[in-house]
Regions:
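Lipid interaction determinants
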Residues: 24-99, 103-154
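Outer/extracellular conduits and scaffolds centered on Gram-negative outer-membrane beta-barrels
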Residues: 9-15
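C-terminal motif of bacterial Sec signal peptides marking the signal peptidase cleavage site
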Residues: 18-22
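Bacterial N-terminal signal peptides that target proteins for export
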Residues: 1-9
Length: 154
């Protein structure tokens, strides 16, 4: 009886040690700065958001879906190391709409289209193959625009 209990405890110890070694952290933490992680081509996979106008509430709209052949705000991106980016249509065309500049500070990507037009996108999440960006804009008439975009590395 004592031998069976000893064998049983040994079997449990072996199972527990195998269990602990099998549960190691598969995804290592990426300590690179955001300005390095963002480099590459990102394909829009999901978008959600809304537009609210207190002057014309009947025109308010909201969306939450996979991208179609057009987009409400931002499409596919390619961010380059030299501080430039291109935005691409969702219809699969490979020609960028233009080549513009970008900067990053405190998890905020600033897209600079020209000296008068800039957009700030907050980075909510970034991994080796996933990027989640958030856009919020408060209009002068107290209206607001919000968009949350999920991308995969392309």
């Amino acid at each position: 009886m004592r031998t069976l209990r000893l064998i049983g405890m040994a079997v449990i110890a072996v199972i527990m040690s195998v269990n602990f070694t099998a549960c190691s952290d598969d995804e290592e933490e990426d300590n690179r700065p955001l300005s390095e992680k963002i480099i590459g081509h990102w394909v829009l996979t999901y978008k959600e958001g809304y537009i609210k106008d207190p002057d014309y509430p009947e025109d308010d709209e909201a969306w939450s879906h996979a991208p179609k052949d057009e987009y409400e705000y931002f499409g596919n991106f390619t961010f380059r190391e030299d501080g430039t980016y291109s935005e691409y249509e969702l219809d699969g065309t490979s020609n960028p709409q233009s080549i513009e500049k970008w900067t990053i500070k405190d998890n905020i990507i600033t897209l600079i289209e020209d000296e008068h037009e800039q957009y700030e996108l907050k980075v909510l999440e970034i991994t080796s193959d996933k990027l989640v960006l958030e856009f919020y804009y408060k209009h002068e008439n107290d209206g607001e625009t919000y968009a949350k975009m999920t991308y995969k590395r392309g």
